[in-house]
Swiss-Prot record:
Classification via InterPro entries: RNaseH-like_sf, YqgF, YqgF/RNaseH-like_dom, YqgF/RNaseH-like_dom_sf
UniProt keyword Translocase present: no
Cellular component GO terms, alphabetical: cytosol
Chain segments annotated as coiled-coil in the UniProt record: none
Purpose of the protein: Could be a nuclease involved in processing of the 5'-end of pre-16S rRNA.
UniProt-recorded name of the protein: Putative pre-16S rRNA nuclease
Protein species of origin: Alcanivorax borkumensis (strain ATCC 700651 / DSM 11573 / NCIMB 13689 / SK2)
EC number: 3.1.-.-
SMART domains xrefs: YqgFc
Superkingdom as given in the UniProt entry: Bacteria
SUPFAM superfamilies: Ribonuclease H-like
Amino acid sequence: MILAFDYGTQKIGVASGNELLGTATPLKALPCKNTQPNWDDIAALLKEWEPEALVVGLPLNMDGSDSESTVRARKFANRLHGRFGKKVWLIDERLSTREARERTGIKKADSRVDSMAAVIIAEGFFAGDAKVF
């Protein structure tokens, strides 16, 4: 069991993933306050789901370079590891939001898109595209 996160400064999409089946399910999008995650909400998810590992999407630029969002996502991953002691994997999530919009048919900002992006991040992890943090 893993939890995958699509980190954003307004919302964090979350999905659960089953490694044996290679499937993921969207859970929810957690709201952020002043660009900061609500750590109590994240702690509650970890307690409920008891994941073996966490996967965070890394929003790289199209040329593979880091952006301001990449730096924030790495910081989020670092804090997840520091606070909860879980193994955290990073995965290139370029175009995951675009694919999530295509899958859901939702074009505007919507929490369902964020949690579907987390599903895509989990699927990438199952495909072997992740790097350990």
